Amino acid sequence: MESYKPVWLKGAVILAINLIDKGYKPVAVGLGERDFYIDVKSDTSITLDEVKKAINENVLANVPIENNQIVYKGNKVSIIEDKVSISTNLNPKYFEILNISTHHPNPNEQYVRIRGVAFETEEQLKDYLTWLEKAEETDHRLIGEKLDLFSFHEEAGSGLVLFHPKGQTIRNELIAFMREINDSMGYQEVYTSHVFKTDIWKISGHYTLYRDKLIVFNMEGDEYGVKPMNCPAHILIYKSKPRTYRDLPIRFSEFGHVYRWEKKGELYGLLRVRGFVQDDGHIFLREDQLREEIKMLISKTVEVWHKFGFKDDDIKPYLSTRPDESIGSDELWEKATNALISALQESGLKFGIKEKEGAFYGPKIDFEIRDSLGRWWQLSTIQVDFNLPERFKLEYIDKDGIKKRPVMVHRAIYGSIDRFVAILLEHFKGKLPTWLSSVQVRVLPITDEVNEYAEKVLNDMRKRRIRAEIDYAGETLSKRIKNAYDQGVPYILIVGKKEASEGTVTVRARGNIEVRNVKFEKFLELLITEIGQRDVEQTTVKALK
């Protein structure tokens, strides 16, 4: 999606100008995950035909932009986008309007929101619309509703997700796996508050350079902020007592809930929210430890993505360099950048460069992952930071008794756990690996006469911490099998009189695979192994065939 966004934004700007020529009053343009949007101030609705008449009617050679606003014929249209710039080299000619809706920013105003895409060639547009049709079939928002995983409610607030029991089960499994990864690298888990005085953000630089994302409020004369990042809090834990060179590296991890004020037009299911949980980690170490630490992080990151079934060709690291707005000296930035380059080269991974896309406090390695629909998602990040230790005056006592500054490394492998859930749901089309599935086995008794045996099978699995449930014979067997398949259940156990008398089950798995006369204890043994190893494939049924 990222590669399309510059041409989409240019298309949105062109269409906004043309709408002005038609007498409409657009107030903002921006980008969503899969399209552009234009907000038009209007007391009445705008039809698709009216929008189509404005497309390509007038294309200015030079778009008049001042202070991130389109300025045209006395109108000012805000550009709600800070990562993608307007390119003079792009010339979108082929548009598709995807949706027109209305919303009310306040009780007295109505905006019409136009969503669409634009491309330079007709072939690009056709290819994208074909892809979009496939993607909509696996939209995580539809899967989430169908499987009863999560929901959003206007009463709760835009971009604030509520995870239901089955959705929370998936999150818990992801967190448990990452805890094991963290333990293998020597992390100590911490917990920090959701709210801090803004003094901490002023020291870190977030207050100035991240101000539009901060949620702040005043209480008893002090200004507080809901945390957008966990790093300053971890820094304070480091500062809570003296440290020596023998203590380093110190590795803190936290599944920390953070909040960022994303623009309403940018919100998109779990992929773009205002509150989410990061699998965050911060390492405090000596300079001589830096290269090996980064190499270990790169290796572990690749190991994690392999566990989810992504191949080497699906994993692409990028070095993101110093942005225009940043803190720290040229010398510190060069030192941090060289450390990342050295570790990447020694890892043997081919990597790309993303100019000026580093964090404001340091360069970083970003990992992009390709899903089953061919989309690339930016997930993992490793950031080297010499600047925040300087700002917070962090110290350790070196072996010669001299106080020195530690280096800080920020890292997250999933990135946002909530966003990763969305990506997995779409990647696996709702059919998650058994270890991640909220319901791993569903038992189907053929008749009520075998309910007692079915319940014994159910309880034996639950005793072994397998997430199992039973669907009694209220509907036909074929209907119940279809329901289980539609709800993404990996294994179905069918039990009748024969199975009850022999202590067996009939096992059905994805792909219409059926294995009869399976000893229940054998199935249970294989399933426990599959779940314990976190296999992506259904290895239990493969072993039974």
Curated annotation (Swiss-Prot):
Region feature Catalytic, mapped onto this chain: 139-433
Any Pfam family the entry gives: HGTP_anticodon
Manner of cofactor binding, per the entry note: Binds 1 zinc ion per subunit.
EC number per UniProt: 6.1.1.3
Enzyme class: ligase
Any Gene Ontology biological process: threonyl-tRNA aminoacylation
Family matches, as SUPFAM superfamilies: Class II aaRS ABD-related, Class II aaRS and biotin synthetases, ThrRS/AlaRS common domain
InterPro entries in UniProt: aa-tRNA-synt_IIb, aa-tRNA-synth_II, aa-tRNA-synth_II/BPL/LPL, Anticodon-bd, Anticodon-bd_dom_sf, Thr-tRNA-ligase_IIa, Thr/Ala-tRNA-synth_IIc_edit, ThrRS_anticodon
Location (main, coarse): cytoplasm
Signal peptide: none
Domain of life: Archaea
PROSITE patterns: AA_TRNA_LIGASE_II
GO CC terms: cytoplasm
UniProt catalytic activity: tRNA(Thr) + L-threonine + ATP = L-threonyl-tRNA(Thr) + AMP + diphosphate + H(+)
Needed co-factor(s): Zn(2+)
Binding site for Zn(2+): 231, 282, 410
Role noted for this protein: Catalyzes the attachment of threonine to tRNA(Thr) in a two-step reaction: L-threonine is first activated by ATP to form Thr-AMP and then transferred to the acceptor end of tRNA(Thr). Also activates L-serine and transfers it to tRNA(Thr) but cannot deacylate incorrectly charged amino acid; unlike most archaea the editing function is found in a freestanding protein.
Record's subunit section: Homodimer. Probably interacts with its editing subunit.
The family this protein is said to belong to: Belongs to the class-II aminoacyl-tRNA synthetase family.
Protein name: Threonine--tRNA ligase catalytic subunit
Species this chain originates from: Saccharolobus islandicus (strain M.14.25 / Kamchatka #1) (Sulfolobus islandicus)
